[in-house]
């Protein structure tokens, strides 16, 4: 005889096609027909300094109100120049991000401390450049990832996978991935490769399966795994991609290259600048929003001490 439905099953029933995920910016939600669709991927394109990080932090912080838990900030920046996530979060939202450092090697104690459960920022993937930079030739003339790099990358997953799993199990339903650099051919980008792996194999992996892979031996942690199941179809992802183009017109004319995540994303928003009289204005436009009505307007926005505002 089956027992009562778990909280994850109940929540998944509530995630219907009419559900919406608020960005935290009411005017942008209106342009998106009420908000983002739950469980989907949204890509924000724009040049460095245009306001992508502010928009991402606004989205993540809004999880505190909308979901009962803030979103995660996964920073893929590998250049060493801080994008000031912690500073912005504290100044704009009085939110102390905290950095996740907890790792769970196989058969080790999996559970993070209360302090780590209050940490919503990770910068565990610090590799940038071309995929080929991390590969070596094989005897048959093809290429494969260098074993030393693979070992280091797999080691980083001992931090990344628990970062997502334990926070999703505690109620987080949104994640912002920042720090993705421009690349002539996105298919050659190591950052796009790692994001694709993260998105398919961790963010949208069955919660029970992910828990069984992290919490070993399973028999010892079965009660925790069962009690912390969550519907991965409710996790909404915002990917912030830096572009070489700065003008909105150039971004709107930008072609989707082979391997570009935007080709498979549900929603695309572009942020660019345009000359308005004697000043340079920042403009926003929704380019794609599958499964929903959307505005075709080009709207001015500002990034101020109060954060990201439209109009």
Where are each of the predicted segments found?
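Phosphate-binding/switch region of NTP-binding enzymes
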Residues: 211-307
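Charged, amphipathic alpha-helical linker segments immediately N-terminal to NTP-binding catalytic cores
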Residues: 1-15
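Pre-Walker A adenine-sensing motif
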Residues: 22-35
